[in-house]
């Protein structure tokens, strides 16, 4: 039997990771044909995935954070083949927040993460397809808007490197006095809501922005996206909620959130609305978000909380 052929796509910011280098060597000694490609600029992940598909690679491994995972997943989804014919997807978490990996209980250590990919059969997983003014996008984890999105977009890269997830909290605290509500209309099957909101989560996965569990019950294999809308609140209540949400206090979120679970959602806003798609901001007045069932296959832990079984 021919050895398994993998293509690891590494975020260029993590080329100095010695643990990953050693782990790659270990997997090669175990008989896996493992090639490494490093991203340097926009479009590299798309190109590397295209080459992997053309080369008949069995598994594509994203080595990086949530943005790298989403880039690689999107590049796979752009191909016409279904999940069974495309390479499976694996993840070595090397980012600052690692929101998807945390919610999925994936191991952080590179050798453990690569070993899991080798040992676990890939499972069908959904992706979110987002249609907006500037063409279609794909999202593997969470699309977010409002307060949490501004925190993520504005968090300094140097601060993230030094402080990890704490950087998001510090940035969030600095914004508490200037939370501006956004007005929009949301509609989906048997769901409609219109008004001003300060935070929004559209979840294939559960958390984003450095640990904000906006969609705590979301599953990535149910064919549905979880919707969480935090309506505008007045005065100090809004500031307090912002602190609690950023600090991961889910009790505060549960008291005020509007929730739904739908296969698709339309969002219409009179003003430009920015959604953070796994770290990539996209601005539009109209979004259509669709959960595409079983778009890819992914290697995940046996008791992964994101799988419904």
UniProtKB/Swiss-Prot annotation:
Q: What is its EC number?
A: 2.7.1.-
Q: Which NCBIfam families match?
A: lip_kinase_YegS, PRK13054.1, YegS/Rv2252/BmrU family lipid kinase
Q: Name one GO cellular component term.
A: plasma membrane
User: GO annotations under biological process?
Assistant: phospholipid biosynthetic process
Matching entries from HAMAP family are given as: YegS
Q: What does this protein do?
A: Probably phosphorylates lipids; the in vivo substrate is unknown.
* Residues binding ATP, per UniProt: 39, 65-71, 96
Which parts of the sequence belong to the DAGKc domain?
A: 1-134
Q: Which UniProt keywords apply?
A: ATP-binding, Cytoplasm, Kinase, Lipid biosynthesis, Lipid metabolism, Magnesium, Metal-binding, Nucleotide-binding, Phospholipid biosynthesis, Phospholipid metabolism, Transferase
Write out the GO MF terms. Answer: ATP binding; lipid kinase activity; magnesium ion binding
Q: Which PANTHER family match?
A: LIPID KINASE YEGS, SPHINGOSINE KINASE
- Taxonomic source organism: Xanthomonas axonopodis pv. citri (strain 306)
Where are the active-site residues found?
A: 280 (proton acceptor)
Q: Where in the cell is it found?
A: Cytoplasm
| Domain of life where this protein originates | Bacteria
Q: What cofactors does this protein use?
A: Mg(2+); Ca(2+)
Q: What is this protein called?
A: Probable lipid kinase YegS-like
Q: Which residues bind Mg(2+)?
A: 219, 222, 224
The text of the family note is: Belongs to the diacylglycerol/lipid kinase family. YegS lipid kinase subfamily.
Cofactor binding mode, per the note? Binds 1 Mg(2+) ion per subunit. Ca(2+) may be able to substitute.
């Amino acid at each position: 039997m021919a050895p398994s052929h993998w293509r690891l796509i590494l975020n260029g910011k993590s080329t100095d990771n010695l643990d990953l280098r050693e782990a790659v060597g270990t997997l090669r000694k175990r008989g896996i044909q493992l090639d490494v490609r490093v991203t340097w600029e926009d479009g590299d992940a798309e190109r590397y995935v295209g080459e992997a598909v053309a080369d008949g690679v069995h598994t594509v491994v994203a080595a990086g954070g949530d943005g790298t995972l989403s880039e690689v997943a999107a590049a796979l989804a752009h191909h016409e083949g279904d999940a069974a014919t495309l390479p499976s997807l694996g993840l070595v978490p090397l980012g600052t927040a690692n929101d998807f990996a945390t919610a999925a209980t994936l191991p952080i250590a590179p050798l453990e993460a690569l070993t899991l990919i080798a040992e676990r059969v890939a499972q069908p997983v959904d992706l979110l397809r987002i249609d907006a003014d500037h063409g279609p996008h794909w999202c593997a984890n969470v699309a977010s808007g409002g307060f949490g999105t501004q925190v993520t977009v504005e968090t300094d890269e140097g601060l993230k490197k030094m402080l990890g997830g704490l950087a998001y909290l510090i940035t969030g605290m600095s914004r508490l006095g200037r939370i501006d509500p956004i007005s929009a209309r949301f509609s989906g099957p048997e769901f409609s809501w219109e008004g001003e909101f300060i935070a929004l989560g559209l979840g294939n996965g559960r958390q984003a922005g450095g640990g904000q569990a906006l969609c705590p019950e979301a599953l990535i294999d149910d064919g549905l996206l979880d919707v969480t809308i935090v309506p505008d609140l007045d005065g100090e209540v809004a500031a307090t909620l912002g602190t609690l949400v950023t600090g991961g206090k889910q009790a505060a979120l549960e008291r005020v959130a509007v929730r739904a679970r739908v296969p698709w959602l339309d969002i219409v806003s009179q003003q430009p609305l920015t959604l953070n798609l796994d770290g990539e901001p996209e601005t539009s007045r109209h979004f259509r978000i669709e959960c595409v069932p079983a778009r890819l296959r992914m290697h995940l832990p046996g008791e992964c909380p994101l799988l419904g079984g």
